[in-house]
């Protein structure tokens, strides 16, 4: 019953023009009330089409603007009704129109709202396409179900994107932390090099000081002895001159001859302008070298060795280590997969290739040569039978035969093998290399497109040992290791070592 009374009250305070609860209600002298905006718009419309005649939109009774009065009583009722409409009890009545109290049976397609029949007739929905809810519910249920599936798919994509960005974030964090570690390590190496250079230079200066001062001290002693001899001789002559005639003449010719033949011994001196001038290390060159090695190590590949039927090498089971053996020994070495017997009338060869061929790109690997007195390493364009007969005599280790290698012999002689002259095409030009610190580990970097092969002394802070330029890579090349006749093995280092 209370709801019915409430609906009746709402009808009394509903604007006849907009069918909404009155807003700033104004009343005419005929008793009808309207929203201020609605009656003002109606007044303007009447002035435009009816030659200034103003009439009530409900009863058509004429009125004058001065007769319009604000209706505060109705405004208070509307305010109370709005509070009642927003109460929890009213809000729970979802099947009735909040404005008109009628059942919500229609769906407005343009506004996508559920409305009552009074809403359909209002100015807000006038001319819109409306349908019974039962007519469109199934259609929109299918559309919503499709939208839900689409949304779930997009949610999965969003979750994957979220996971991907988190993974990328973590990857970048790891990479930058790794780069920070490398930068710190590189500069620590630079500091070690500078400390070593300083210590070495100070030792050289101390040695120079010791040698010079020792020589000058010896010269000083000789000069003191010479001066003392002069004093004694002068004293003897003064004594003769002051003594008797006998003293004067006794042995006088010998003394005069001794004085005339006397030559002053001059001390050994050292010219300061001929000294070795100290020059600070080329820090820019060092940084460039470190950057080159750091860049090369980004292309570290996991190289393993490939057996062949022409090498007298022993390859370990993990295919990372190779050593030479006496060609007369014919048994299987423990822990090895491959051994090769001596071949009649065939020179003793211990070279082996890596399994991985290089046809493009950049490739880097490191070889442990510690405690070896002889070795050869680098890259090779593949074994050629006609080039193997004199290989152990170094006659074919030339770039023109597909070998870009450096080597060690007799424990201290480092060399690079270059092409021989036209007069001796089978004899390589062996160039000695200046290596201050003997490498226990050598890095090899191949840039196929740039046609270069570089060798780094990892033991000595990665200093460049030698670099081949303008290499003629006309076919695939392979890592090449040759332990020679030194039985100590050569070992390919893993990228994680």
UniProtKB/Swiss-Prot annotation:
Annotated localization: Cytoplasm; Nucleus
Pathway assignment: Protein modification; protein ubiquitination
Main subcellular localisation: cytoplasm
B box-type zinc finger locations on the chain: 92-133
Protein name per Swiss-Prot or TrEMBL: Tripartite motif-containing protein 5
Database matches in PROSITE patterns: B302_SPRY, ZF_BBOX, ZF_RING_1, ZF_RING_2
Enzyme class: transferase
EC number from the UniProt entry: 2.3.2.27
Catalytic activity field: S-ubiquitinyl-[E2 ubiquitin-conjugating enzyme]-L-cysteine + [acceptor protein]-L-lysine = [E2 ubiquitin-conjugating enzyme]-L-cysteine + N(6)-ubiquitinyl-[acceptor protein]-L-lysine
Phosphoserine: residues bearing it: 87
Post-translational modification: Degraded in a proteasome-independent fashion in the absence of viral infection but in a proteasome-dependent fashion following exposure to restriction sensitive virus.
Domain B30.2/SPRY, chain residue ranges per copy: 283-497
Effect on the protein of changing residue 237 to K: No effect on dimerization or higher order self-association
GO terms under biological process: activation of innate immune response; autophagy; defense response to virus; host-mediated suppression of symbiont invasion; innate immune response; negative regulation of viral genome replication; negative regulation of viral transcription; positive regulation of canonical NF-kappaB signal transduction
Record's comment describing the protein's domains: The B box-type zinc finger domain and the coiled-coil domain contribute to the higher and low order multimerization respectively which is essential for restriction activity. The coiled coil domain is important for higher order multimerization by promoting the initial dimerization.
Subunit structure: Can form homodimers and homotrimers. In addition to lower-order dimerization, also exhibits a higher-order multimerization and both low- and high-order multimerizations are essential for its restriction activity. Interacts with MAP3K7/TAK1, TAB2 and TAB3. Interacts with HSPA8/HSC70, PSMC2, PSMC4, PSMC5 and PSMD7. Interacts with SQSTM1. Interacts (via B30.2/SPRY domain) with HSPA1A/B. Interacts with TRIM6 and TRIM34. Interacts with BECN1; GABARAP. Interacts with ULK1 (phosphorylated form), GABARAPL1, GABARAPL2, MAP1LC3A and MAP1LC3C.
